[in-house]
Amino acid sequence: MKLRPLHDRVIVKRVENETKTASGIVIPDSAAEKPDQGEVLAVGPGKKNDKGDLSPMAVKIGDRVLFGKYSGQTVKVDGDELLVMKEEDLFAVVEK
């Protein structure tokens, strides 16, 4: 199944955090927090402004983004857990 987001929504796949600290301590799965960053898999066409024109999206497919721990709606697609959220729920794009 393939998802195509509508309006100003994006589909994001969480990127797992490191399970080992810089000092070498391994963090067990039970103590690990949900990752707060992910990769954009799909982008909607944008949000319409007051004049009816589409405002372009600030993110694109492949961008690594930061978001709140409880942002978006979780959906399962082909065994993968994905997030559907509005573009305004994203905090930043991680530059490499």
Curated annotation (Swiss-Prot):
Domain of life: Bacteria
A cellular component term, taken from the record's GO annotations: cytoplasm
UniProt cross-references to InterPro entries, sorted A to Z: Chaperonin_GroES, Chaperonin_GroES_sf, Chaprnonin_Cpn10_CS, GroES-like_sf
Keywords: Chaperone, Cytoplasm
Protein's UniProt keywords contain rRNA-binding: no
Keyword Manganese carried by entry: no
Gene Ontology biological process terms, A to Z: chaperone cofactor-dependent protein refolding
Family matches, as Gene3D superfamilies: GroES chaperonin (2.30.33.40)
Localization (cell): Cytoplasm
Any one GO MF annotation of this record: ATP binding
The family this protein is said to belong to: Belongs to the GroES chaperonin family.
Function as written in the Swiss-Prot or TrEMBL entry: Together with the chaperonin GroEL, plays an essential role in assisting protein folding. The GroEL-GroES system forms a nano-cage that allows encapsulation of the non-native substrate proteins and provides a physical environment optimized to promote and accelerate protein folding. GroES binds to the apical surface of the GroEL ring, thereby capping the opening of the GroEL channel.
HAMAP family per the UniProt record, alphabetical: CH10
NCBIfam families: PRK00364.1-2, PRK00364.1-5, PRK00364.2-2, PRK00364.2-4, PRK00364.2-5
Quaternary assembly: Heptamer of 7 subunits arranged in a ring. Interacts with the chaperonin GroEL.
Protein name in the entry: Co-chaperonin GroES
Species assigned in the record: Polaromonas sp. (strain JS666 / ATCC BAA-500)
